[in-house]
Amino acid sequence: MILVGADASVRPKITKKGIKMLIKTEQLEKELKQNNPETVFLLYGEETYLLENSLKKIKKNFGETINGINFVTLYENNVENLIQEIETPAFGYDKKLIVVRDSKIFQRGGKGKSKEKEQTIEKINNYIKENYNDVVNTCVLIFVEENAEKNKLYNTIEKLGTVCNFEALKINQLNAKLASISRAYKVEISSNDINYLIENSGTNMQDLINEIRKLIEYAGEGGTIKKEDIDALCTKQIQAVIFDLTDNLGKKEITKSLQILDNLLYSKEPMQKILITLYNHFKKLYITTIALEENKNIAVSLNLKPNQMFLTTKYKKQASYFKKEELRNT
C-alpha cells in the first residue's frame, strides 16, 4: 500500500480487488527500493533478518538522523509517550523518525493486559485515525513487533499505512536467496547442496547468511561450494546431529553412533539437552508411525511449519528403522 502524499489526497493504493492491505515481504522490498513515500508501518513476524533489513532501508530512505532530535525509539515501558513524540517538532528537520519496538500493543483484549495498557492502545488508535494527515506530515512511524494480532490499532494501520508480516521463508525461498548471495560473489553452489546446508544449519536466515559467507570466503571467487565443504566448515544444529545419530542407531552402526555422541559431548552440549532432544525426536518418530498407520498427514500430525516440510521424508525414513513398540517404549 502506497501513500501518495501528506494532505487530503492521502489514501491507500487501490487494486482491481479493492484496497490492498497486508503486503508480502517481496512487495515491501520492491517499494522500498523505489523509495516510495510510506509513512506508517507495522512490521512483524519471525523472520527477523529480513525484517531488520527492511527497517534499515526505511531508515536509509529517511535520511540523516540525530538521536533525540529527529529520531526516537520507544519500547513497551514508554509507549504511552508516542503521541507526545509525534507532536514534538524535530527542530531543524522536516520530519521525525519514530520507531516503536516490542510494545506489545498489537494484542487483542485479555492475555494479562492491564486496563492502563488497553487505554493506551485505544488512545493511540484514535489519535492516528483522527490525525492521520498530521502524522504523515510530521513523522515516519514504524512499529516493530515479534507478534501482532488484529486489534483496532492493527486494523487502522492496515487500512491507512503498511502492514507486513515477515513469515518464516519456505525452503525454495531460502534456497533462492542463498543462491543469489553466492552468485553475487561469483561462487557456484548447487540447489541440492543449498538444501543440504539448510537441513544441517536450520532455517534461520541470519544463521544461514553467516554459514554461506563462511563457505563463499573458503571457495573464493570463481570457486564452487561442495557438500564436503559444508560438512567441514558449517555448524550443525543439534537437531541435524540427532538425525545423524538416529540414522546410525537405526542401521545398528553402534561405533558411528558413539562417535557422534562423543562429538556432541566434546562440543559441550549438556547431556540433559542431548537426552531431551533425543526423547523428543523419538516421540516424533512414534507419531510418524501412528500417522502412517492411520493414513494421516504427517506434517499436520507433527505440527511442522511450512519451511520444515522437507523433514517429513526424513521422519518417515527413520521411523521405518524401528518397531512401533520400540518407539513407544523409548
Regions found by a protein language model. Give the residues of each.
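Hydrophobic/aromatic-lined pockets within catalytic cores
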Residues: 220, 250, 265
